Amino acid sequence: MLKVKIVRLNKQAFLPVYATAHAAGMDVSACLEEPVVVEPFSTALIPAGFAIELPIGYEMQLRPRSGLALRSMITLANSPATIDADYRGEVKVILINHGPQPFTVNNGDRIAQMVVARVEEVSFEEVSELGETVRGDGGFGHTGTVRS
């Protein structure tokens, strides 16, 4: 199991936890002095109250919680959000309200999930052309919407 250092920056912060034994992501909770209202079609930056030190070669992704998206149309504005291994500041979540009603975030509300993953460093080789494939440059819906 990978060990990741974590610092609780606020005594009321909830540290990330796996909700079930085989969950891929850990729940991230809001760390707030007072509730924050995310107005319709607006964003809010919500602190999590902790900072992490990832090993080199890893990243942390913040992702939406499906239940929030389904019930309240709340998701992450930059999904997935990447926390790099050299970042040492407080983890914060950019929530966006796609719904028509204001949404209130309270201290301790589970607002996102985080997944720690390996990252492969790459170098680019500039070439004059790329190898051919059946797909070629087809993209953005080129395969249609109906399964045959």
From Swiss-Prot:
Entry annotated with the keyword Cell inner membrane: no
Domain of life: Bacteria
Keywords on record: Hydrolase, Magnesium, Metal-binding, Nucleotide metabolism
GO BP term, pick one: dUTP catabolic process
Keyword Metal-binding (UniProt): yes
Binding site for substrate: 65-67, 78, 82-84, 92
EC code(s) of this entry: 3.6.1.23
Sequence similarity: Belongs to the dUTPase family.
Protein name: Deoxyuridine 5'-triphosphate nucleotidohydrolase
Naturally occurring in which organism (per UniProt): Chlorobium phaeovibrioides (strain DSM 265 / 1930) (Prosthecochloris vibrioformis (strain DSM 265))
